[in-house]
Every structure is written in structure tokens, then in C-alpha cells.
């Protein structure tokens, strides 16, 4: 949040936005926790040989699909919040856009569990994450 009188001075982020950011953060932290538990509970799953996307296949695949979708919601939510927090400047424009692309990609991975579309969405997610690091 920018101070209009002095653009270099930081204005405290409103408490409401900090809570919203915390909820989005918790949603993204739950993602690896859920896939770790799901991978441990899935017979025959080897995390050293198989990707977490393979957990979305088979009879219990709905758990990982839901995990991808919930993480997508969290990332989209955080993109919205970051847009409000980073008022003005290049970061305020591009970082939330790249995060939103990542969130939509997570939805795509949840819906399309098989290649080639699944891989296309994975490439979109990874690129959005990498470009987001350069924008910051």
C-alpha cells in the first residue's frame, strides 16, 4: 500500500488484508501437506519415481484433484490480495497477473488429469511461478 504524499514511505497494510493474506497462505501451505498424506496412504505410490500428479489418477484421485483445485483457489485469492497490497508500480500489475495465471493453471491440472493437456497446464504453472520471481 503506497502513501500518496510520500511515495517512498510505506503505509501499514490494513489488518483485514493481512488476515486475508494469511488465509491464502494457509491454503497454499496445505497443498504439500495433503499430497504428502495422500501419497503415504496410497498403496504402490513411490514419491521418488512418480509425480504428485499421478495421485490424481485412479479411484482415490479425486483427493489430489480437489487438492489442486483448492490450491488454485488459494493462489487466485492471494493474487487478488497482492493486487490490493502492492498499489502502484510494475509489481502491482504483473505479480498478481502471474499468480492468477498460476491459479488458473492449478484448476486446469485438477480438471485434466491426463497428458497432453495436463502437461501444458504444468508448463504454464511453472513459467508463471518463475516469471513471478523475476517481477518481485
Q: Where are the model-predicted features located?
A:
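Hydrophobic, aromatic-enriched alpha-helical segments typical of multi-pass transmembrane helices
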Residues: 8-51, 55-136
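Short, intrinsically disordered terminal tails adjacent to the first/last structured region
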Residues: 1-7
Amino acid at each position: 500500500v503506497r502513501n500518496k504524499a510520500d511515495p517512498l514511505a510505506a503505509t501499514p497494510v490494513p489488518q483485514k488484508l493481512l488476515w486475508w493474506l494469511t488465509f491464502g497462505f494457509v491454503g497454499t501451505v496445505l497443498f504439500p501437506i495433503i499430497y504428502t498424506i495422500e501419497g503415504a496412504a496410497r498403496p504402490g505410490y513411490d514419491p521418488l519415481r512418480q509425480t504428485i500428479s499421478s495421485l490424481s489418477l485412479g479411484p482415490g484421485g479425486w483427493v489430489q484433484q480437489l487438492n489442486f483445485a483448492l490450491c488454485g483457489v488459494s493462489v487466485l485469492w492471494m493474487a487478488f490480495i497482492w493486487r490490493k497490497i502492492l498499489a502502484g508500480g510494475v509489481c502491482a500489475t504483473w505479480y498478481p497477473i502471474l499468480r492468477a495465471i498460476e491459479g488458473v493453471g492449478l484448476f486446469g491440472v485438477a480438471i485434466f488429469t491426463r497428458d497432453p493437456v495436463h502437461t501444458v497446464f504444468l508448463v504454464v504453472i511453472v513459467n508463471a511461478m518463475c516469471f513471478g520471481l523475476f517481477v518481485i
